[in-house]
Amino acid sequence: MTTEQSVITDEMRQAIGVESEPWTVEVEKTGVRMYARAIGYTDPIFFDEASAKEEGYRSLPCPPGFLGTPIFDPATSDPTFGQPRRGQRRFNTPYTRGLNGGTDIEYFTKGSSDAICAGDVLQASSKIADLTERRGSLGPMLITTSETIYRRDGTVVAIMRGTGIAY
């Protein structure tokens, strides 16, 4: 970048690594089935509980990417379908446009008997992991990396890392 002034304020830097209040994520059979169908999965383990149990799962397993699905709960969510109200802080920046820079989910479960399945109740919390500035072909950009940690009975079962690009 040139000698442009940084849009990353001290307040923004202080927010890096600060974990939000936890919120509850209930994994439900209907949600698993709908997500699997929408994505195009055809494996019966995502639709039929008997098939899932034959493969060693406790119930219908979460398909890859399921945890990244936004869930609107009127009691806890932003009415504009954003993050939970107690999720990550939002900051004012001069940028008016945004892009999803991608999502990666790392699972810490060990095999089918330990997989995240329908019926699980997870606790999730999020934090800003990093803020960086770069110059792209359209000008300066603010890149925000966030992490959402999913716990089952206090044990981390997955971490979702997402990248947002403001420009």
Where are these regions (language model features)?
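Hot-dog-fold acyl-thioester-processing enzymes
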Residues: T2-G102
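HotDog/MaoC-like acyl-thioester-processing domains
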Residues: M1-R13, T103-Y167
